[in-house]
């Protein structure tokens, strides 16, 4: 699998530069099932041990990888999933909560976990999930100081637009500032016979400062340090000091 070779190259670079976590794009293994002729052909059965076999070449003593793929469950359901691969084993999975704006072959995930590697506690929100404020806030409330955003904005040429990169960056800044967390987005970039992605990869710090931004339409490699200790108090989390605001917000959420 060519993607595994590419990821291995990036892991080797991470090892040489002292980088501890590598975030890969959404669906980097096999692409997105929504564009596959036979989605089951690119799906990986985690419970049968197939994922461990596929990821074995990525084993590293110092680098943890976040790898996107299509998961198939024993009952045949498909999930858009990211695996955390740490020291030769899968230590966690995140299933995309909002598979698509309109229609998708993927089932929605129903868990909002956080993960720990070394001193870093982090969450994962896949692509469209980042547009919703709730998953990020729930993860931050569980102690996450960073959010990784595997993304795949590869679209048919007539739909591809560089404006999508601007929208993604604005979303990253919003999630970072709202939750006082670092946001690390990893997108695909370039052209294939049928798809185009301008590439929205970037790193934003907890104050909303853009630390790194990828070149458009080309492969890139972004690096930044992230904070591992939650800032207290987190910005804007003390709305309860005004009971009227809290009551109105509770009513709004309840009525949605």
PLM segments and residue spans:
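C-terminal/domain-edge helix-coil "capping" segments
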Residues: 236-256
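Short, acidic/polar
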Residues: 2-11, 130-137
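Short beta-strand scaffold segments in enzyme catalytic cores
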Residues: 67-69, 80-84, 113, 201-203, ...
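A hydrophobic, small-residue-rich beta->alpha segment in the mid-to-C-terminal subdomain
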Residues: 213-231
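Cys-nucleophile CN-hydrolase/nitrilase-fold catalytic domain and related Cys-dependent amidase chemistry
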Residues: 4-87, 154-174, 178-179
């Amino acid at each position: 699998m060519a993607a595994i070779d590419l990821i291995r190259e990036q892991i080797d670079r991470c090892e040489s530069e002292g980088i501890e976590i590598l975030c890969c794009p959404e669906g980097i293994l096999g692409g997105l099932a929504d564009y596959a002729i036979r989605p089951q052909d690119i799906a990986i059965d985690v419970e049968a041990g197939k994922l461990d076999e596929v990821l074995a070449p990525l084993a590293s003593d110092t680098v943890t990888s976040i790898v996107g793929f299509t998961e198939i469950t024993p009952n045949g359901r498909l999930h858009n999933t990211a695996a955390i691969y740490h020291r030769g084993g899968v230590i966690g999975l995140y299933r995309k909560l909002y598979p698509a704006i309109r229609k998708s072959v993927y089932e929605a995930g129903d868990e909002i976990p956080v993960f720990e590697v070394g001193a870093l506690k982090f969450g994962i929100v896949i692509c469209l999930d980042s547009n919703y404020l709730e998953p990020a806030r729930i993860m931050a409330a569980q102690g996450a100081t960073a959010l990784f955003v595997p993304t795949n904005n590869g679209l048919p040429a007539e739909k591809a637009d560089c404006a999508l990169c601007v929208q993604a960056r604005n979303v990253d800044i919003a999630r970072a500032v709202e939750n006082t967390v670092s946001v690390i987005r990893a997108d695909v970039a370039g052209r294939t016979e049928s798809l185009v992605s301008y590439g929205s990869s970037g790193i934003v710090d907890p104050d909303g400062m853009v630390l790194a931004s990828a070149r458009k339409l080309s492969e890139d490699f972004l690096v930044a340090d992230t904070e591992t200790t939650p800032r207290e108090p987190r910005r804007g989390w003390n709305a309860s000091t005004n009971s009227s605001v809290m009551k109105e917000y509770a009513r709004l959420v309840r009525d949605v």
